[in-house]
Design a protein with these regions (language model features):
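Glycine- and acidic-residue-biased ligand/ion/polar-headgroup-sensing regions
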Residues: 14-27, 31-33
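A conserved beta-strand element that flanks and buttresses the S-adenosyl-L-methionine
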Residues: 268
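A short glycine-rich, Lys/Arg-flanked "PGG" loop and its adjoining helix->strand segment in the class I
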Residues: 280-295
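Conserved short histidine dyad/triad with adjacent acidic residue
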Residues: 1-14
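Short, glycine-/aromatic-enriched active-site segment of Class I SAM-dependent methyltransferases
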Residues: 298-313
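Short acidic-glycine-tyrosine-enriched beta hairpin
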Residues: 33-54
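Double-stranded beta-helix
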Residues: 62-99
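N-terminal juxtadomain amphipathic helix
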Residues: 102-180
Length: 313
C-alpha cells in the first residue's frame, strides 16, 4: 500500500484477522461494533508489529509510509473477498478524517524525538474544549483524545496535534472563571515577589500563554507597571488589553521575537507547554527574552499527581 492511502473500512463477522507489517507504517483505526458504548480508537503500527482484529471489529488502515504487510485470516478463503461470512464493508474513515490523521498524527516524541511511544489511554474522538454548537444538527470537528507515554524520556503527550491557529486564534476557555486558578496565581505572585526580590518599579515580567491575564493581574494590583502577556487568542488578548494588562497577540515563536521587548526579569509559563507542539522552539524563545540574571518558572501537569488527586474531569 502506498503512503497516504486507505485500506479496509470493513469488518469480519466471523473470522479473526491477523496483520503482520513487514515494511512501512500505518495508523490503525478500529471500533467494536457489538459493544454499544464502544469508542473509535487509533494506534500506530510499526515494522514487525502483529495486530489481531477480532470478529465484528470495524477497522481501517491509513498508511503514513509505503508499506508491505501479510494479511492472515483464519477461516475458509474459497469465496469472494466481500461476502456474508468473510468481509462486510463498513466505511467509518472518510476522506476528511484521512487527511486529518495524516496531517496531525504525532509519530515521535515532542521532547526527545523518540518513536518509542506507548498508548496509555484512549477516550475516543472528541471536539475541541468548550466548542459548543449553536444548532442541534450542526457538525463539529472531532479529534482522537488519546495519551501516549514516551518510553525514552517519559513525557506524556497527546497522539494528535491540532493546528494551533484553529485551537487558539479564538480560544474558548477563560482562566479567570476558575476561582482556584485565581487564588493559585495570587499566591504564586506573592511568592515570586518575595523569593526573587522583584521591584514594582524596575522588574519586567512576561507571562507566556497569558489567557485573559489571570497570572499577571496580581502584579498589576500591586502596582507593577512593566508586565506583558503573550497570548495567541485574539479574543483573550483583546480582553486582557481592555483590562489594562498589556498583551501581545501572537504565538511565542522565533518570527515574533523581534516584536517583543526583551530582558525580562521573570518569565512565567503556566500550563502552556502541554499545548505546544514545538517545545524546543518555545524554550529557545524564552531564553532570548530573558536577561542573564533572569528566571523562568514553568508549570506543567504531573501525571502521577493528576491521577492520585483526581484533578481531572
Amino acid at each position: 500500500s502506498k503512503k497516504g492511502t486507505v485500506r479496509a473500512n470493513h469488518y469480519h463477522p466471523i473470522q479473526e484477522q491477523k496483520v503482520l507489517l513487514i515494511k512501512g507504517q500505518f495508523i490503525s483505526i478500529y471500533k467494536d461494533l457489538l459493544k454499544k458504548d464502544s469508542i473509535k480508537i487509533t494506534h500506530v503500527v510499526n515494522e514487525g508489529d502483529l495486530i489481531v482484529t477480532k470478529p465484528n471489529v470495524a477497522h481501517t488502515m491509513v498508511f503514513t509510509k509505503d508499506s508491505i504487510f501479510l494479511n492472515l485470516v483464519r477461516g475458509e478463503r474459497e469465496h469472494e473477498n466481500y461476502g456474508i461470512t468473510h468481509t462486510i464493508k463498513h466505511v467509518f474513515v472518510e476522506e476528511e478524517e484521512r487527511k486529518m490523521l495524516l496531517e496531525n498524527y504525532k509519530l515521535e516524541c515532542r521532547c526527545c524525538s523518540s518513536k518509542n511511544l506507548k498508548r496509555v489511554v484512549s477516550l475516543g474522538y472528541q471536539p475541541l474544549a468548550n466548542n459548543l454548537l449553536n444548532k442541534k444538527n450542526s457538525k463539529c470537528e472531532l479529534y482522537p483524545l488519546e495519551m501516549n507515554l514516551c518510553k525514552e524520556c517519559f513525557n506524556c503527550q497527546l497522539s494528535i496535534t491540532v493546528n494551533p491557529k484553529k485551537m487558539f486564534s479564538n480560544y474558548l476557555y477563560l482562566s479567570s472563571t476558575s476561582k482556584t486558578f485565581v487564588k493559585h496565581f495570587e499566591t504564586a505572585a506573592e511568592k515570586y515577589i518575595k523569593e526573587f526580590k522583584l521591584s514594582h518599579k524596575n522588574s519586567y515580567i512576561i507571562d507566556v500563554g497569558s489567557n485573559d491575564g489571570v497570572a499577571l493581574k496580581p502584579f498589576k494590583d500591586k502596582k507593577y507597571k512593566n508586565i506583558l502577556g503573550i497570548e495567541p487568542a485574539k479574543n483573550l488578548a483583546k480582553l486582557a488589553n481592555k483590562n489594562k494588562i498589556k498583551t501581545f497577540n501572537g504565538f511565542l515563536e522565533m518570527k515574533n521575537i523581534r516584536k517583543i521587548k526583551k530582558n525580562a526579569d521573570l518569565i512565567l509559563a503556566s500550563n502552556v507547554f502541554a499545548h505546544s507542539d514545538n517545545l524546543k522552539e518555545m524554550a529557545e524563545c524564552m531564553l532570548k527574552l530573558l536577561k542573564k540574571s533572569g528566571i523562568i518558572v514553568i508549570e506543567v501537569q504531573y501525571l502521577l499527581n493528576t491521577i492520585k488527586d483526581l484533578t481531572f474531569d
